[in-house]
Amino acid sequence: MMINRIYDSTCASACFFRSTVHPPKRKIMLQITQKCNLHCAHCFAESGNIGNEMSLSDIRQFILPQLIKNQVVKVTLTGGEPLCNPSIKQITQLLLDHEIGVSICTNATLIDPLWIEQLSQHKNIHFNVSLDGMRMESHGRFRGGLSEETFKKIFQNILILGKHKLLNGILTTPNQYATIDEYVDLCNFAKEVGANYVLMNPLSPFGRGVETQTLAYSNAKMCALKEKTKSIISSDFEVVYIRFPNIEHNPIGRCPLGSILYVFCNGDVAICPYMVFAANGNNSYNPRDFIMGNMFKENMDFTTELKKFHKNKIFNSNIKQETCLHCSRGCYAIKISRGQELSDCDFDICPLS
């Protein structure tokens, strides 16, 4: 499967996604549970130990036929913590049996080593692991107060994934509990265990992140972090800097709106999950404005729905090109969280700001 890159190191990255697939093929994210066994300070979805789950029978009956119909070749299983879904193994196998690639985003606390060994026989499966520091005092605290046993288990499980060549990326949110040198160590660790990249996301104003912005790195620390980790990048290892300060005044990277759809546990399909998360905050937007339909209630044609969505919804092309010649729309979700118009500039990373 050829990757369609969203992240471009020559641009100021606006989008939280690193890559998708080339059309007419599609990639989606499937929220198979709202439950999570942790309580992270920055969780977009505000997940906890209660919530709904997507059943194996619903996926088989409603979701899978529409994935095939819409040429979906890659599914990211997410949550909550997707491994909290008791049918995670069967769901994964169902997708693999229909030649749909699977990526699992996990906190790595619930990994079953025997299952990982079995999955290593497949070529189209990998894991992305969240890791926000190298110490109990950083990662453990940021992730809701982990026990020493759980903290050690996370690293053991990362090593297991690396051993079986199933570790694709490490996802990290720079935060005040961890030092810059700690993130240098994290990148070196990821490279040593066989990850292809470390993706650094800022602590964004969605979900619990609204209330924990004081934990975010300052712009100066973000710049220093980037400077100290750039040397770790190599031909087979990438550090992905999402929405870092644009001190180089680079043009804003593209927005792949509609190229990675998100299916919530209740079957709702979002044109972008972050727009829905942002609209759940204290602003003038309605989360329903960014829902295209429901896969449990209708037989959706994604191409048709996307065309209708762009035509009938609140998007327009009023961006002031005469003053923003080196800019693009940037991230809609960030603008929603800031209470801006969708046609406004993404001022956080605009090269002219």
What are these model-derived regions, one by one?
Residues N49, E81, L110, G133, ...:
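Flexible, active-site-proximal loop/turn residues at the rims of small-molecule/cofactor binding pockets
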Residues M2-H126:
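Conserved alpha-helical substructure of the radical SAM core
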Residues M2-S19, V276-S353:
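Flexible mid-to-C-terminal extensions adjoining Fe-S/redox cofactors in radical SAM and related proteins
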Residues K35, H39, E46, G258, ...:
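Cys/His-rich metal-chelating microdomains
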Residues M29, T33-C36, E248, C265, ...:
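Residue-level signal for mature regions of secreted extracellular proteins and peptides
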Residues P82, T109-I111, P174, L203, ...:
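Hydrophobic pocket-lining residues within nucleotide cofactor-binding pockets
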Residues N128-D132, E137-I260, C265-A270, Y274-G293:
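Radical SAM enzyme [4Fe-4S]-AdoMet core and its adjacent flexible, acidic
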